[in-house]
Amino acid sequence: MEEGERSPLLSQETAGQKPLSVHRPPTSGCLGPVPREDQAEAWGCSCCPPETKHQALSGTPKKGPAPSLSPGSSCVKYLIFLSNFPFSLLGLLALAIGLWGLAVKGSLGSDLGGPLPTDPMLGLALGGLVVSAASLAGCLGALCENTCLLRGFSGGILAFLVLEAVAGALVVALWGPLQDSLEHTLRVAIAHYQDDPDLRFLLDQVQLGLRCCGAASYQDWQQNLYFNCSSPGVQACSLPASCCIDPREDGASVNDQCGFGVLRLDADAAQRVVYLEGCGPPLRRWLRANLAASGGYAIAVVLLQGAELLLAARLLGALAARSGAAYGPGAHGEDRAGPQSPSPGAPPAAKPARG
C-alpha cells in the first residue's frame, strides 16, 4: 500500500483522541535522586519536606500544605526543646573543659594513662560528648519535627535508663566492698600524688573538705617517694599543705611549706600543725550521711529522663498520625474523585436488564 493510502487510515484511527505524550518520571524540588519509598519512610530521615517527598514518590500534584500539629502536640514539641536546651549547653561546656584539660596535660607531657582507672578530664570530655549529642538530638528533632533525630534521642534516653539501673543495682549489691576499698584507693592516690595534677587536686579537696590526712592516718604519706623520710629531696618527712590545720596561716595565700618536717615530730607535736586522722573513716561517714540525698538526686534524674522519653513518644505518635492523615488513602483525591467518562475507544457499558 502506498503512502498516500495509509494516511487517511491513520487519521481515522486517531480521530477524536488526544495526542499521545511521552510519560516523564516525576521530579521533586529536593537535591539528589528520588529516594526509594521503603527507605525514605523507614526512619523519617529524608532531607525533603514531607509533602515534597510524597509528591516525588507518588507523582501526585500538591493539594495543599501539610496539616499542622494540634495545640497539645505543639506544646510537647516546644517543651522537649526547652528542657533539652540547657543540657545541650552544659554538655558542650563539659566537652570543651575536658578537651582543654587533655590538651593542657598533653602539652605538659603528662601521661594520659595515669594511676586513675579513667582520667578525670577524659571522663569529663566523654560525658559531655554523650550528653550534648543526646540533648542536641532532642532539641533539633523536636524543633524540626525530624522523626529520625527523635528516635535517636529516645534510644539514647532509654540506654541511659538501662545503664543507670545497672549501676544502681551494682552499688546496692556491692555497698560493703565499695566502702572497704576506699582506703586502698586513697593509698594508691597518695603513692601517685605528684604524677597527675588532676589526682593531686582531687586528693587535696578531699583532705581539705573532710579535714583529714592520709588513708588511715597521716603516716600513710610515708608511702610517697617524695614525702618519705628516706627521700633525698627537700620534701622528705613532710606532708602536703592540704593536711595542715591552717594552710594559709592567717595569710592571703596557701603556705605550701606548712607541713614540712611534720613526719619527724611525735603525735602530740604534729597534731598542732596537721590533722592526724585518715580520710577513710570520715569519707565513709560522709557517704552514709549523704546516701539519702544521693538517692533522691538519682530518682529525680530517672524521673526526668522518663518524662523526656514519654514526651518524645507522644511527639512521634503525633507526627505519625499527621503523616497518615495527610498522605493516607483518599488524601490526594483518588477516593473523592467523581465518575470518570469512558474513553472514546472503550466499549459501551452494558445496561441492566429490566424485570
Curated annotation (Swiss-Prot):
Expressed in the eye, including iris, ciliary body, retinal pigment epithelium, but not lens (protein level). This is Tetraspanin-10. It comes from Homo sapiens (Human). Residues 1-78, 142-154 are cytoplasmic. InterPro entries: Tetraspanin/Peripherin, Tetraspanin_CS, Tetraspanin_EC2_sf. The keyword Ribonucleoprotein does not apply. SUPFAM superfamilies: Tetraspanin. Residues 1-33, 327-355 are annotated as: Disordered. Disulfide bonds join 212-279, 213-243, 229-237, 244-258. Interacts with ADAM10. It is found in: Cell membrane. GO terms for molecular function: enzyme binding. Glycans are attached at residue 228.
